[in-house]
Amino acid sequence: MASTKPILAVGTMDSKGSEIAYIAACIRKTGCTVLMVDVGCSTVTSKHNNIKPDVSREEVASFHPAANADRVKKPRHDFSDRGEAVTFMGEALVGYCNANRSEFSGIIGIGGSGGTALITPSMRSLPVGFPKVMVSTMASGDVAPYVGCTDITMMYSVADVAGINKISSVVMGNAANCMSGMVRWGCNLKSGLGGSQKPTLGMTMFGVTTPCCDAVRESLQDDYEVVVFHATGSGGRALEKLVSSGLVSGILDLTTTEVADEVVGGVLSAGPERMDAIVQSGLPCVMSLGALDMVNFGGRETVPAQWNGRLLHVHNSEVTLMRTSVEENRKIAAFIAKKINQSIGPLTLLIPEKGVSIIDVPGMPFHDSEADKALFEELEKLVQQTEKRKIVKVPCAINDPLFAQEAVREFKKITSFEVKLDCTDEEHSPIQIPAAVPGPRDEILHRLKAVVASGKPIVGGGAGTGISAKFEEKGGADLIVVYNSGMFRMGGHGSLAGLMPYKDANAIMLQMG
């Protein structure tokens, strides 16, 4: 069934107006609606300017973090260079898409190198599973910088994006039909297409932690759908993209080897943002130190000369591993501890005391108890343990069956974690309060504002009308309890939109049956 929400057809309409209009026409023929979005930066008059966009460049630019819409009204040469213009409009388009995410059903872009660099960041900002197609002259080469770790469909334009002809009309028409098909008959990623209805877990794995991860996955598969990510840099980023998209219910980040590459300088880093989405998600997470005994390089000849004196292990013809040192492990521990200390959900860090990989055990090439000890002790020193954030030491190697059992046990434990509320502090949760005395509205609001200013939590209750007016004026609600009648009266058919002002977007709503 076709979505009632429009598809965005995005391009620099100062130079690609006819192409965007053609794609829009093809989409309309499929029964879908479309909005043409202009992200051009030039004001040079051209034959394309008679094609009017549905969303102007000025409107898109108004969503730039700097909100400097006037900048794009100037000729392109007012920017320091063309790259600055592309960056500016790319950032603005990200803001536009994020702000209007619920108002469109898919996004299709067209462009050369500049247009592709401008449009794809907004696509990467959208959740996995959201329809996104990019027709590009760059799609026959290395598309990693454009795609990142998300599911952008890249289509090579074959001919340059310069007018409608026998070749471009077919390619662009197919791209338009591809987009319409995704929107009309796409799969709901949260439920799959006739797939599992089990909660989804994300888990990181490497070849040298496979026995552990396989055992954990098999133990949990009756209750969960476990999606495994190869911790090769892109794998870690993909996991965190799914986490930030709200598509997983828990995390088993057992193989954190990408941190070693980030800290030391290997080729499989997931970047300095590794773990950010995980610790900020609030999701239950069991984390471990899988494969932190190694830094990854390509073939032996690719290892930088500065590491020639180090312990190297040729994993295969394309992969060479370098054993991490005591000092490097302390730095790795500092990186991980800093991230863990920012966690807002239940998180357990499991330390495999007898080895972090299949080659970090007695008799294997990377066994180094001193280096491992430095890693473990630094983590114990730096991680700020709380009721929800704990370190658990396991007296075995990571691939021993005991470790997998402990990982499963800890995950089940933290998924049933309950916050214990202390209701004995009268300053924050009074148990004896005077009966409410009706009074003039202005007087009530004055008292309300005084309480808000004091920083105390506020619980509001009612059918909706009264508390809505009060919180609209001052805001600061922590908890609002409403009756069904109030929900219908204020928002219509269960919607809370009318009840919740933007400034109270973080307030918690409870419905009384």
Predicted regions located by residue number:
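N-terminal amphipathic alpha-helix/helix-capping segment at the start of soluble metabolic enzymes
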Residues: 423-462, 473
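Short, acidic/small-residue loops that bind anionic groups at enzyme active sites
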Residues: 109, 118-147, 156, 227-231, ...
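C-terminal non-catalytic interaction/assembly regions of soluble proteins
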Residues: 6-8, 15-35, 268-428
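N-terminal glycine-rich phosphate/adenylate-binding segment common to multiple enzyme folds
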Residues: 78-142
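Alpha-helix-loop-beta-strand connector modules within alpha/beta enzyme cores
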Residues: 377-381, 443, 493-513
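Glycine-rich phosphate/diphosphate-binding loop of Rossmann-like nucleotide-binding domains
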Residues: 16-28, 35, 45-54, 195-237, ...
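Phosphate/nucleotide-donor binding subsite
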Residues: 48-102
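N-terminal phosphate-binding or glycine-rich loops at protein starts, especially the Walker A/P-loop
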Residues: 2-45, 106, 115-125, 129-134, ...
